[in-house]
């Protein structure tokens, strides 16, 4: 996929594309067999022991994305939920888990509404001094239970939706991000115009919808918990210079 954005002349871009890519003959791609994941029937856990200074927790729940959702609004409600939990200094994680309860030194929540297949709503964090991974895990579950039983207030909902929309709009100030978003949407089989409709989709989300997705998807049957157990660090051993740091 080639995406060109910025202060360019479309006719010139098209001519250059024809010049450099036109002579290339199309190839017949092999048909990709459907990747069907075995349905998860219960909570999955894994532990990784590795040289590290601090323990680390990751919790992931399987959730739908725009391309796979039966209810179109659900992925957008999950984006709003991520903002409620981790949307700046006034978010619930920052206010309650870090400052008030002091159970986490750092914690984040992330959802991706745009991908080819179902994705994972991820919460990750590091315990505060004197606290354990289990303490953080329980504090996270308590926050999710609160959202399941108590709808967010209209004031909090509006504040978070404004933040989510502002973040998506400000990112488009970057020419690189514009190209990345347009290319990503087309590559996963979605309409690039979803970039423009995203703010309206977020604005339409209600407190009841946020509560519904929390109740529907944040269950043990769709949960995977991973814990990094720190082991003594050998300072004489060179650290890896590449790769996924979460897999070490």
Positions of predicted regions on the chain:
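Non-catalytic, conformational "gating/processing" segments within enzyme and secreted inhibitor domains
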Residues: 1-20, 222
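Extracytoplasmic/secreted cell-surface and envelope-processing proteins
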Residues: 10-14, 133-134, 223, 235-238
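Non-catalytic beta-strand/loop surface segments
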Residues: 23-68, 83-132, 155-166, 173, ...
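Short, solvent-exposed beta-strand edge segments and adjacent coil->beta transition regions
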Residues: 1, 118-122, 195
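Solvent-exposed, non-transmembrane alpha-helical starts
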Residues: 15, 69-74, 132-136
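A common structural junction motif
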Residues: 19-28, 141-152
């Amino acid at each position: 996929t080639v995406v060109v954005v910025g202060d360019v002349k479309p006719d010139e871009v098209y001519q250059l594309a024809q010049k450099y890519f036109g002579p290339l003959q199309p190839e017949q791609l092999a048909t990709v067999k459907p990747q069907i994941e075995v349905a998860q029937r219960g909570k999955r856990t894994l532990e990784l022991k590795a040289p590290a200074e601090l323990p680390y927790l990751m919790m992931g729940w399987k959730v739908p994305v725009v391309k796979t959702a039966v209810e179109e609004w659900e992925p957008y409600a999950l984006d709003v939920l991520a903002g409620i939990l981790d949307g700046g200094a006034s978010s619930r994680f920052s206010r309650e888990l870090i400052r008030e309860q002091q159970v986490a030194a750092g914690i984040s929540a992330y959802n991706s509404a745009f991908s080819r297949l179902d994705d994972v709503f991820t919460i990750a964090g590091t315990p505060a001094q004197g606290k354990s991974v289990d303490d953080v895990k329980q504090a996270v579950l308590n926050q999710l239970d609160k959202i399941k039983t108590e709808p967010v207030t209209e004031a909090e909902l509006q504040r978070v939706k404004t933040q989510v929309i502002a973040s998506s709009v400000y990112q488009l100030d970057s020419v690189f991000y514009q190209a990345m978003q347009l290319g990503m949407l087309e590559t996963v089989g979605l309409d690039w115009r979803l970039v423009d409709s995203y703010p309206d989709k977020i604005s339409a989300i209600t407190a009841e919808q946020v509560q519904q997705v929390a109740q529907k998807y944040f269950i043990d049957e769709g949960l995977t918990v991973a814990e990094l157990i720190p082991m003594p660090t050998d300072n004489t051993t060179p650290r890896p210079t590449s790769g996924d740091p979460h897999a070490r």
